[in-house]
């Protein structure tokens, strides 16, 4: 009896010692630059951690910039996201599989101002950014948006970006070209694209530039 128990115990020790450890989640990007106080709440955690240059980013992260802060994030697919002050960004979904030609990204901004610079989109790709009122679908472009609970203002700097209301019951989509902007309120489709003046466009650029 004791011999069997000893043998079983030895077997369990061997199996435990040779078992592969749980794989750590893969990083999807890093903090490239920041000014001021910026924090992240990891998926499954409740407390915020301070961000620093080089901090790894993971799917499920919720990121915030405080008043006066700026933040630049560099992702593994070449995308760059720049946040102005008082901005909340959630990295809801991030799949980048270049060998399979697949890219599936969903970012969510509940408030604040941000810039997305998307350099490469794979053949089978879906890259979306959601705000409180709008959904932006892109296939390689440079654009800026400011989100409040009531409305989202968006301007394209390069390329094209398709914009629609986040509510499926409000149909209608506009496609912005370089220099064009639109506004999406909670209860209406996007406004017709109009060319923004230099002052308004440059203000958006300045507010999302990280020194």
Each PLM stretch: what is its role?
Residues 1-4:
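Positively charged n-region of N-terminal signal peptides that target proteins for export
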Residues 7-17:
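Bacterial N-terminal signal peptides
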Residues 20-211:
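Flexible, surface-exposed loop/linker segments and immediately adjacent secondary-structure boundaries
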């Amino acid at each position: 009896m004791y011999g069997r128990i000893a043998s079983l115990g030895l077997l369990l020790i061997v199996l435990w010692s040779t078992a592969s450890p749980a794989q750590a989640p893969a990083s999807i990007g890093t903090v490239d630059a920041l000014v001021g106080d910026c924090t992240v709440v990891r998926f499954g955690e409740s407390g915020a951690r301070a961000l620093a240059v080089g901090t790894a980013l993971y799917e499920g992260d919720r990121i915030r910039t405080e008043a006066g802060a700026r933040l630049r994030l560099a992702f593994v697919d070449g995308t760059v996201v720049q946040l102005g002050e008082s901005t909340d960004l959630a990295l809801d979904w991030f799949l980048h599989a270049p060998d399979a030609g697949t890219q599936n990204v969903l970012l969510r901004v509940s408030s604040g101002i941000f810039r997305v610079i998307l350099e490469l989109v794979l053949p089978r790709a879906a890259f979306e950014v959601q705000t409180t009122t709008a959904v932006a679908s892109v296939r390689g472009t440079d654009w800026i948006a400011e989100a409040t609970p009531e409305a989202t203002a968006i301007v394209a700097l390069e390329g094209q970006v398709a914009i629609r209301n986040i509510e499926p019951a409000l149909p209608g989509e506009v496609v912005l070209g370089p220099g064009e902007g639109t506004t999406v309120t909670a209860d209406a489709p996007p406004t017709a694209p109009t060319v923004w003046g230099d002052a308004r466009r440059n203000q958006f650029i300045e507010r999302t530039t990280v020194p």
